[in-house]
């Protein structure tokens, strides 16, 4: 299933301002948050809104998304948050605090489903591998539900008990003296961490956490035409969710090794081709390396050093599937450092014959200097 456009997710046009993006996110996050929404697919919608906001609220990520779409949306994405929240730097409490002045809004249900943490994996590709794409089997460390206790954290054959300190509510009342008098606040129970349940006998495998550290093998398809610094999102391959929530995502960040002959500029490939003075002066047909194999290139007589030739369709494929780049060949004259006596005599004879024509002689000197 293809991903929806991020602007469409937030109900915005492509030219939306940062303030409009933030307002749209706050409205939709409040609407779809699992603690509030009764819609069946609220978790997925909240996750979709969160993902769109994370990209469009960041100038660099937004520019990458506008240029490359979902394939390049997260270029340069930094570290990822922990698995105990829906990630993203603008939480549900922020939404309510903006309406109620902070602290007085509804608290998150600790037993509500929560998305698992996102993971990041760095991979280095050869120049040609990035051009043509490849499949990789990567091994990443993840926290998965404990097989022994099925993720409950309790010893098999036992179950969690209702917390006696909060009577299973997950919250306790705390009185505070303020300049306005004594007030009573509700806060998370410290004994059960707000869950309302206690583990009397912990699982000996996971020690009550309900999770164990494992190494998981994941197949990752690198699309043809991916460039250095771009990343691939593998949905649902991050950390396991909490309380039945969806798993996080895996982000594979691509690094491409430099090539000794080719350079890349977007979908185009650039190279320099050394030629002799005779080839450029008299014309020649030469073989030029490309990532697709060698091709023949005709050099017209009188070609000047620095001249650029275009090999159509010999560049990198567009990572979004929009055609193929070209290869540009820049020719450079190579001045010989060692000459035989015969070669020197021929050059002196040539120089003597053409010395009367200052313009031609000047061109010759500039050609040998590589200007």
UniProtKB/Swiss-Prot annotation:
Binding site for Zn(2+) 1: 146, 149, 203, 206
Annotated zinc fingers (CR-type), start-end: 133-215
Keywords in alphabetical order: Chaperone, Cytoplasm, DNA replication, Metal-binding, Repeat, Stress response, Zinc, Zinc-finger
UniProt remark on cofactor binding: Binds 2 Zn(2+) ions per monomer.
Cofactor(s) the protein requires to work: Zn(2+)
Annotated InterPro entries: DnaJ (IPR012724), DnaJ_C (IPR002939), DnaJ_domain (IPR001623), DnaJ_domain_CS (IPR018253), HSP40/DnaJ_pept-bd (IPR008971), HSP_DnaJ_Cys-rich_dom (IPR001305), HSP_DnaJ_Cys-rich_dom_sf (IPR036410), J_dom_sf (IPR036869)
GO cellular component labels: cytoplasm
CXXCXGXG motif repeats: 146-153, 163-170, 189-196, 203-210
SMART domains noted in UniProt: DnaJ
SUPFAM superfamilies: Chaperone J-domain, DnaJ/Hsp40 cysteine-rich domain, HSP40/DnaJ peptide-binding domain
Biological processes annotated in GO: chaperone cofactor-dependent protein refolding; DNA replication; protein refolding; response to heat
Pfam families assigned to the protein according to its UniProt record, in alphabetical order: DnaJ, DnaJ_C, DnaJ_CXXCXGXG
Main location per the UniProt record: cytoplasm
The protein's assembly and partners: Homodimer.
Family the entry assigns: Belongs to the DnaJ family.
Domain free text: The J domain is necessary and sufficient to stimulate DnaK ATPase activity. Zinc center 1 plays an important role in the autonomous, DnaK-independent chaperone activity of DnaJ. Zinc center 2 is essential for interaction with DnaK and for DnaJ activity.
Alphabetical list of NCBIfam families matching this protein: DnaJ_bact, PRK10767.1, PRK14280.1
The protein's name in its UniProt record: Chaperone protein DnaJ
Organism listed in the record: Bacillus cereus (strain AH820)
Gene: dnaJ
């Amino acid at each position: 299933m293809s991903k929806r456009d991020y602007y469409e997710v937030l109900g915005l046009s492509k030219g939306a301002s940062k303030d409009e993006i933030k307002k749209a996110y706050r409205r939709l996050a409040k609407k779809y948050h699992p603690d509030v929404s009764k819609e069946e697919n609220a978790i997925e919608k909240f996750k979709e809104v969160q993902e769109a906001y994370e990209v469009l609220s960041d100038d660099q990520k937004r520019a990458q998304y506008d240029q490359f779409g979902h394939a390049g949306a997260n270029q340069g994405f930094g570290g990822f948050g922990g698995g105990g929240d829906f990630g993203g730097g603008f939480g549900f409490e922020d939404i309510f605090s903006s309406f109620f002045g902070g602290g007085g809004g509804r608290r998150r249900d600790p037993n509500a489903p929560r998305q698992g943490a996102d993971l990041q994996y760095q991979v280095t590709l050869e120049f040609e591998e990035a051009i043509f794409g490849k499949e990789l089997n990567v091994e990443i460390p993840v926290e998965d539900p404990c097989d022994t206790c099925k993720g409950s954290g309790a010893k098999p054959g036992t179950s969690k008990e209702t917390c006696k300190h909060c009577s299973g509510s997950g919250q306790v009342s705390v009185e505070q003296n303020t300049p306005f008098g004594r007030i009573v606040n509700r806060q998370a129970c410290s004994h059960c961490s707000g869950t309302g349940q206690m583990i009397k006998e912990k699982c000996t495998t996971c020690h009550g956490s309900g999770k164990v550290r494992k190494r998981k093998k994941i197949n990752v398809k690198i699309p043809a035409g991916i460039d250095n610094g771009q990343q691939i999102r593998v949905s649902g391959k991050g950390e396991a969710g909490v309380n039945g929530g969806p798993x996080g995502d895996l982000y594979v960040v691509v690094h491409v090794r430099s090539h000794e002959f080719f350079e890349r500029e977007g979908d185009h490939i650039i190279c320099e081709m050394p030629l002799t003075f005779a080839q450029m002066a008299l014309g020649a047909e030469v073989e030029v390396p490309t990532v697709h194999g060698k091709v023949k290139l005709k050099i017209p007589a009188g070609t000047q050093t620095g001249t650029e030739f275009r090999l159509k369709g010999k560049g990198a494929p567009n990572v979004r599937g929009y055609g193929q780049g070209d290869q540009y060949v820049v020719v450079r004259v190579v001045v010989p450092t060692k000459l035989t006596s015969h070669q020197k005599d021929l050059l002196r004879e040539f120089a003597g014959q053409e010395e009367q024509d200052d313009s031609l002689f000047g061109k010759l000197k500039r050609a040998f200097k590589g200007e």
